[in-house]
Amino acid sequence: VLELHTFSSLNPEFLPLYQGVLAPADEKWVYYSPQAVAHKKLPALGSEDVRSAFGSAVRVFDNKEELETALRNTGENNAVVMMSSGNFSGLNFDELFASY
């Protein structure tokens, strides 16, 4: 899961630079917080903007609870890579992955 968190990564004009970066991943997930976009006073960012940059196979999350539910449903024996300069809106990884 890649979190878009920095000023540049949340900027719709910067997003095309991500083209192909998740290509090696079996599943491609991207998370961003609309609240972070608003807090940074950046132009609105939509799921389609993200999908256009990363490709149609990407699963886009803009809601922490939906991301958490999806992560809980990944099942055992899966490697999940979390990449961010942020904190996934405060997601508690110890609790989330405690059963694994």
Model-derived regions: residue spans:
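ATP-dependent carboxylate-amine ligase
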Residues: 1-100
